[in-house]
Amino acid sequence: MKNKVDVAIIGAGFAGSILAAALVKSGLRVALIDSTRHPRFAIGESSTPLADMILRRLGKNHQLPYLEALSTWSTWQSQFPEIACGRKRGFSYYQHHRHQFFSEQFLGQGSLLVAASANNDVADTHWYREEVDQFLFRQAVNLGVTEMLGHEIVQIEKEPSGTFTLRSVCDRGVATLHSGWIVDASGSSSVSASLPYARDLTHTLRTETRTTFGHYRAVGSWSQKLKELGHNLNLNPFDSDDAAQHHLLENGWLWMLRFNNGITSVGRTEWIGPAPDGKTENGERPDISKPQALPNDFGDYPSLAEIMAPASLTAPPQGVRSTGRLQRLVAPVLSQRHLMLPTAAMTLDPLHSTGIAHALAGVDRLLNIIITKDNETELDSAVHQYETSFLQESELIDELVSTAYLTMGDFKRFTAACMIYFAGAICSEERYQDGQNPTHLWNADDRNFVQFAKRACFALRQSNNDYQAIISEGLAPWNTAGLMDPRVQNRYAYTATK
């Protein structure tokens, strides 16, 4: 193994592997370091139009055509059918009530479908991470990246020369690596966050949730269940199973992401912070020492219990995985040449499927910094912008996600909260589509939009106000997709920009 590289990347997930491949294509020496090996179980699986636009951009700009192929359902299926994924036409939401089958008195009363693509050919995807991550890692290694799997980082030192020395423990003993740059792509492991000079900002986050998740075989079709319950599916813009499917429950929600290998990712996320009035229903905050269950406690929700009845857990092998509080936030700049990808610096929440896009945007930005910034002044400015963009994006998404949770008990308010997120996402998509190079995702660099979002979220968290008018009128400058239109009955077919 070479013990000197230009860039050491900690974490061999999809983002680290894509970054490594692009850096090697530019002529740099790169090592990928990870304490585990492929294949491995992972979540963070739902892509979005914004993520796929950035993926195509990375593929074109860095001569990595396989990334372009993975950016739509049809090209993925035609070029890499052996890698499992799921077709994602959009986002679907259904509000459930305890001890009742799902029902609506009128279309959209307790359901919302938001299309993210015009048809199946250009649909987004759910990533079966076990296979996707392994594929992207092998592509990077085939291009010349130094492979260091099974290496646990135990020490990082910055030398007087400005370079770094990384020491890791592996089966063969202790390994030493010297590098000019460090990029932490370790995701929720967040190796750099444990360093004494890391700046922990978790206390600034509003969102407080935990999650329990696993992969199941033989999960029933929600679309078929809706048919059995007498719902007219012809009015839907897409099959609700071809979606990031959100089932809203008391104090949280359940996700279902269906892959084309018979496996469904199922996860339950629960709000564990204070309710809008400072209390939960029984006056106490949830006891997070008691794990959530999957799927045994779905008996309270009979529609879900029926589609989960035939299901069996396939991964992780030790049983469903549960977290404590999910949220963490660390400033992503440890030093001028020691940086963290967004998904290593923050874990927020799966609600709006922001993780893949945020990770890929970070890859795109770091490639620009590492490859093109030659002098110290340019580098200082670019690194400062990198941190500023990340923190402003994180603040906005935290505001939107926490507000969505606090309004889940009122489906109209929850839907309105989601519309703010969709407006920001669509604005970003349109900017990428126009060939722009935005410094932020989700329109977080538009001061007027951010101020509107804060006002709207404040209104949504209050019990007595005309939030519908506040949001409908305030959203107008950015509402290119007809959001908040009561005539469509929560069925949005034309939000896609592909």
Q: What name fits each language-model region?
A:
Residues 2-13, 31:
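Beta1/beta-strand and adjacent pyrophosphate-binding region of the FAD-binding site
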Residues 16-17:
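N-terminal Rossmann-fold NAD(P) dinucleotide-binding loop
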Residues 117-139:
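Short beta-strand to alpha-helix junction loop
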